[in-house]
Amino acid sequence: MTEAQNIQPVTIHGLTLANFRNAESAQYTFGTGLIFITGNNGAGKTTILEAIGLTSFLRSFRFALDREMIRFGSSFYRIETGFSVGTAKHRLSIAFGRNPEDPKAALVKKYMFDGRANTRAAEIIGRIPTVVLSPDDLRIIAGDHAERRRFLDLLLSMLYPAYFAALQQYQRALKMRSQALKSRPDEGMLAAIDRELASAGVQILEKRRQFIP
C-alpha cells in the first residue's frame, strides 16, 4: 500500500451552504490565522463546523445520515468550500438529494472539484484535512469496537488514498456477496467474490496493524 499522501498547509477561505440543516442559503468568508465562531444557541455554529467536516470526511462527524442534513421541506443540500493548498486555490462541492422536478427519483450524492463534475469520492476525501474534537468523541473510547473502527477508517482514508480504495472495494464485495447469497449463485461466482473480499481485507488489516502496532 502506498505511503501517506503529503499533507500541505490548507487554508479555508469561504463556505457556501444551500438547504443544509437550518440554512436555506448562507455564505461565509474566513480570514487567515486563528478563527473563532461565536453566536447564540441555534445560530448555526455547529452547522458551519459540520459542513467543513463533511468536505473533509465526506460524512458527518455528528453521526447523521445525509438525508437528515437536508433542510426540512427541501429535496437536496449543497455545500461549497473555497480553500488553498500552499499557493494553489481550489473549490470543492458536495451535493446530496434528488431532482426537485422528480420527487420519485433516487437520492444521489455528487462531488465536484475545481469545476469537474462526477469527481470520485476517493479524489475528494482528505483534500481538506481536519481534526474534530467534540463530546461525541467519547464514543471512540467508551463506545463499542464499531465506533473505534469507524474513526480509524476515517483517519487512514485521509492519510492513505489506497486504504480508502481498498475499503470501498471491501464494502462493495461484501454487498455483492450478501445479494448473491439471496439468489443462490453458483460456487464460481461466490469464489470470485470471496477472493476480492480477501484481497481488500488483507490490505485493510495490514495498514491498521502498521498504524497501531
Show the residue positions of the predicted features.
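Pre-Walker A-like glycine/lysine-rich segment at the N-terminus of P-loop NTPase domains
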Residues: M1-L54
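Short, glycine- and charge-enriched coil/turn segments that flank and shape catalytic ligand pockets
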Residues: A4, G86-A88, R184-G188
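ABC transporter nucleotide-binding domains
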Residues: G33, A51, S75, R127-P129, ...
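Phosphate-binding site recognition
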Residues: G53, R67-I70, G188, R195
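Regular, well-ordered alpha-helical segments
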Residues: L54-F57, Q179
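Nucleotide-state sensing region of NTPase/ATPase domains
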Residues: F57-E147, L156-L159, Y163
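An accessory alpha-helical subdomain
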Residues: R139-P213
